UniProtKB/Swiss-Prot annotation:
Cofactor(s) for this UniProt protein: Mg(2+)
Assembly notes: Oligomer of 12 subunits arranged in the form of two hexagons.
Gene name as annotated: glnA
Described function: Probably involved in nitrogen metabolism via ammonium assimilation. Catalyzes the ATP-dependent biosynthesis of glutamine from glutamate and ammonia.
Annotated positions binding Mg(2+) 1: 138, 248, 336
Gene Ontology terms describing biological process: glutamine biosynthetic process
Protein name: Glutamine synthetase
Organism: Methanococcus voltae
Native organism taxonomy: Archaea, Methanobacteriati, Methanobacteriota, Methanomada group, Methanococci
UniProt family annotation: Belongs to the glutamine synthetase family.
Length: 446
């Protein structure tokens, strides 16, 4: 969908009655304004063409991370290429959504728009390097059922299990059909390691399209789960003693229209650019995780054990390091950053990952030697000797690392950087001062 006329025709053919103008807040939570389509009225088509071309005004003061009430008039400008009918809504009176960029009333892009932030960094990358950034995420999630008023895993199945143990198979299949109707190229779906845990993989794309897809992916899964009487959660660690949900991010950069990570004559068949990119990610990891793992709960997943990616090192096939380079070479050469979880804002996560990697490329950092042994089995002394550090153990420490990171601050921009730190510091303080059931049960008899 690249023109107003094509968008209008799509809306007519699909009998769209409501059009959701969608955007995200600083957390990556989708928001929308539903516009009623009135093509049967005298002015309906003209009004629709007007909002598709010029956007919708809205009050941004109640959107977390946006603006104050005294300067709250903002505009949602739709990206026509994202217009899609929602397959879970009735077809006779269809609902469609269109993803928007956020602008100020003076016509300038809003510096606090996460999607706009990613687009700005990508534009700078393209201008400097003639570069493109591709990402292929692997978001995991849990399907929960309600038992006696308590949410519990939807089944007792394990990795790659089949029916009848995999009780989420039918729902997962319906999710795949819905995603395909929304334009996804779904590559695989399966039950994950933990009870009630699932994964649906879709093909990589450029960073903006992929970030859009992550938001659509989560909305689709949560909606279909609710319609099935269960709960889908992308919480990183919903249950103690079980694996958490990650969102491994496979990524590559192309320069001058060509993949840049492969060099058949270099060590590990990885180019100097790829090794420098890895070096940049490793150098900024402690600050990166504040954005890629942005909740208090994220750090309950990032603990030793449960295959958690806590070790700041890289490897080829070794999944005990935070960066892995999968076996594919040639055009398929990519870097997998294993820390992120699906609670992140994908626009901001992709922004800081690219910024960190490109910092390594610009400075021609040399990645350390890959660690091909099981880091989980290494003692603390062995890890120190090998210069293998760990990610921050909590959100507060990660935020403190972000405060000091000038590269990530520049990438995010002052508005998002300051708002993000302010919001996340308050979130951690609320957690720090809360009295948990564990504490009460542990200490009530003192």
């Amino acid at each position: 969908m690249t023109s107003l006329e094509m968008a209008l025709e799509y809306i007519k053919i699909n009998n769209v009655k409501f059009l959701r103008f969608q955007f995200v807040d600083i957390h990556g939570e989708p928001k929308n304004i539903a516009y009623p389509v009135k093509l049967g009225t005298a002015d309906g088509e003209e009004e629709l063409m007007g909002v598709l071309e010029n956007g919708l005004f809205f009050d941004g003061s109640s959107i977390e991370g946006f603006v104050e009430i005294e300067d709250s008039d903002m505009v949602l400008k739709p990206d026509l290429s994202t217009l899609s009918v929602l397959p879970w809504r009735p077809s006779e009176k269809s609902v469609a959504r269109i993803i928007c960029d956020v602008y100020r009333k003076n016509g300038k892009p809003f510096e606090g728009d996460p999607r706009g932030c990613l687009k700005r960094v990508l534009a700078e990358f393209k201008e400097e390097f003639k570069g493109e950034y591709f990402v292929g995420p692997e978001p995991e999630f849990f399907i929960l059922k309600n038992e006696n008023g308590k949410w519990v895993p939807g089944d007792d199945a394990g990795y790659f299990e089949l029916e009848p143990l995999d009780e989420g198979n039918d729902l997962r299949r319906n999710i795949v059909f819905a995603l395909e109707n929304l334009g996804f190229h779904v590559e695989a779906s399966h039950h994950e390691v933990a009870p009630g845990q699932h994964e649906v993989d879709f093909k990589y794309d450029n960073a903006v399209k992929t970030a859009d897809s992550v938001i659509t992916f989560k909305t689709t899964i949560k909606t279909l789960a609710k319609q099935s009487g269960v709960l889908a959660t992308f919480m990183p660690k919903p249950f103690f003693g079980m694996n958490g949900s990650g969102m491994h991010c496979n990524q590559s950069i192309w320069l001058d229209g060509k993949p840049s990570f492969y060099d058949e004559n270099n060590a590990h068949q990885l180019s100097d650019i790829c090794l420098s990119y890895i070096g940049g990610i490793l150098e900024h990891t402690k600050a990166l995780v504040s954005v890629t793992n942005p909740t208090v709960n994220s750090y309950k997943r990032l603990v030793p054990g449960y295959e958690a990616p806590v070790n700041i090192a890289w490897a080829n096939s070794n999944r005990t390091s935070i960066i892995r380079v999968p076996a594919a070479r040639g055009k398929g050469t990519r870097v997998e950053f294993r820390a992120p979880d699906p609670a992140c804002n994908p626009y901001l996560a992709f922004t800081v990952m690219l910024a960190a990697g490109l910092d390594g490329v610009r400075r021609k950092l040399i990645a350390p030697e890959p660690v091909e042994k099981n880091i989980f089995a290494m003692s603390e002394a062995e890890k120190r000797e090998a210069n293998i550090d760990s990610v921050p153990s909590n959100l507060y420490d990660a935020i403190e690392e972000l405060r000091q990171d000038k590269v990530l601050k520049k990438a995010l921009g002052d508005h998002i950087f300051n708002k993000f730190i302010e919001i996340k510091t308050k979130e951690y303080d609320a957690y720090r001062t809360a009295v948990t059931d564990w504490e009460f049960n542990k200490y009530v008899r003192i």
